[in-house]
Amino acid sequence: MRLLERGSTRYGKRVGKEKVAMGEQENTELVQRIYGSFRDGDIPALLDSLSEDVQWVTAEIEGVPVGGTWRGREQVGQFFGTLSDVQEARQLELREYVAQDDRVVALGHYAWHVKATGKVWESDFAHVLTVRDGKITRFQEYTDTAALGDAFREG
C-alpha cells in the first residue's frame, strides 16, 4: 500500500500534490547523491543510502560476474567490489531523472572497460530505484545486455 498517492485520501484527509512532489524531490536528490558517491569512489557513502534489505538487480548474463540479484547492503558491497575488479568506468553521464511516488528513474549513458578482455562497451541505460523512508530499497538496471555480454567474451 502506498502512503502517498496523487488525489488519494489517507485517514480521511486529502493528500495534496505538494506533499507528493516534495517526496519526489527528496527521492530524486537521494538518487543524485548515490551517483555522486559512485563517481567519487565513496562506496561506503553509497551503501549508507541503501536500506538493510535492499535488492540490487542486474541482468544475469553467462560469463558476466556482476549479474543477478544482490540482497542486503553486504551483498551490494560485494557487487561493487566485483564490479571494480572486473570493469573500470570510462564514462558516466546522467541525462535525466524522472520521479513518481516512491520511484526515481535515472536515464543516462555509460562506457566501461572490461579488464580481462580489454574491450570497451557502452550503452544508454535506465535505472529504476525505489525509495522508502529516505533509503533506496530496490535498484533495477536496464542496459544493452548484448554489448555487455560481448565485452566479457574473449575473441
Residue ranges and their predicted role:
Residues R2-E52, R153-G155:
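Short, low-complexity N-terminal intrinsically disordered segments enriched in polar/charged residues
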Residues G7, Y11-G23, G81-G155:
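A beta-strand edge to alpha-helix "cap/lid" segment located at domain peripheries
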Residues M22-Q25, G67-E74, V120:
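Residues at secondary-structure transition points
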Residues V31-G41, V64-G67, L83-Q87, L107-H109:
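Short, mixed-charge, low-aromatic patches
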Residues V31-I34, L46-L47, V54, G72, ...:
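Hydrophobic pocket/interface hotspot
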Residues D40, R71, T117:
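Short glycine-rich loop/turn motifs that provide flexible caps or phosphate-binding loops at active sites
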Residues A45, S51-D102:
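A solvent-exposed, acidic/Ser-Thr-rich amphipathic alpha-helical stretch
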